[in-house]
């Protein structure tokens, strides 16, 4: 049994679980319709609950929700629902609040005709492919609900939030990984004097190798694979570039 502490809109309320004495955001079609403060109710079928007593990367959920319009909570909830269809119960829906906060700022930027450029967008597409595909639902949702158009740069940022929800990894860490991989790619292109075709299979393979290399470097994990002498003998230029990349990561 819940008790309403605040009605957000027809599709959302903030309510206290009377058994746990903890506060939640409850989202679902019609869950707030006709509700009054202090009214008691059972959670309807198909609703999602989000605990307010938690800390997020952007601060307290309880403080965050005060500055977020309910429609952005609904949009974030819809994206997380799509994420759960792909990634199952491994998705941490607790990222609702920072995700909704990000979407709120993104919409404000779009409405002011402020274009943001994320230099890592193409890398994020490859590094976090599945997350990016789910995040693309942002475009459809914003078009249908708010009649505004978003681009791949905004989708890329949402993809990082989804990745954070899957791997219990901060968005800033995912961004750091993408940035480190981009630096490695830049070093390869500079050393070879040739750009890498981002649409090629080789690029996809290289990006994924780089991603796991960066992840291992950040945790101190070492590979039990000794091919150094062979690679130095057979591919000296490639070996030198790889050595420089590893030194740069340190």
Regions found by a protein language model. Give the residues of each.
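A cross-family "folded-core" feature that marks the main globular domain of proteins
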Residues: 1-250
